[in-house]
Amino acid sequence: GKALRDGAISMAESTWYKYARKLGYSEARKPEKKTRKKGSFNASRPNETWHMDISQYKTLDNVIFYTYTVVDNFSRKIIAWDISTKKCSKIRTDTVKRAIKNEFDITIGNQSLDLIVDGGTENNNKTIHDFIKNCEVTINKKIALKDVTFSNSIVEGPYKIMKSYYFRSKEILSTTIYEELKFFIEDYNNNRPCHKHKIYTP
């Protein structure tokens, strides 16, 4: 390129690039291929793998809320949830406790599962660590795209549906968001067909 512009080489531009390709010079200009993030993971049974995350939502009256969910990988069901104006480890831990009670109850002993989280401090802190350490259920907490190759998109999916299809056309206020969220979760779990299960709900 520069040699042609400076007149140091006398040949057609197309000829120059043809020889440059043969000699491998053009390869250096190609950008490196980025490593593609791998997709999610499909569990083979219910309560084999759970995903948890927190999503932020600002209401029409400018109040920020945090929605906490735990989603079962196999069924795609939201098995525990909460909502608060606070982002804290206690609420996060309480949702895991609730998920365990909802799913195992009297069969709580001799159970084990993988818990997939993102790398944020809301999912990785002493409160969560201490609970997992002393829990009757064996919980293997793993960070998505770090401890495992797949993402945490399973738990992010319901949030996207909630915001795009349930909340977008409504005037969500701080006084109504709890009931709106409750309706969404009940509808998502019991009425809305899940893509993975085709015509069936989680």
Task: Label the model's feature ranges.
Residues 1-49, 129, 202:
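Basic, flexible linker segments flanking DNA-binding modules
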Residues 47-58, 69:
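Two-metal-ion RNase H-like nuclease active-site motif
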Residues 60-66:
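Short, flexible loop/turn motifs enriched in small residues
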Residues 72-73:
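Short, acidic, Ser/Thr-enriched surface-loop or helix-capping motifs
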Residues 77-78:
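Hydrophobic "anchor" residues
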Residues 179-202:
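Charged, gly/pro-enriched flexible loop segments at helix/strand junctions
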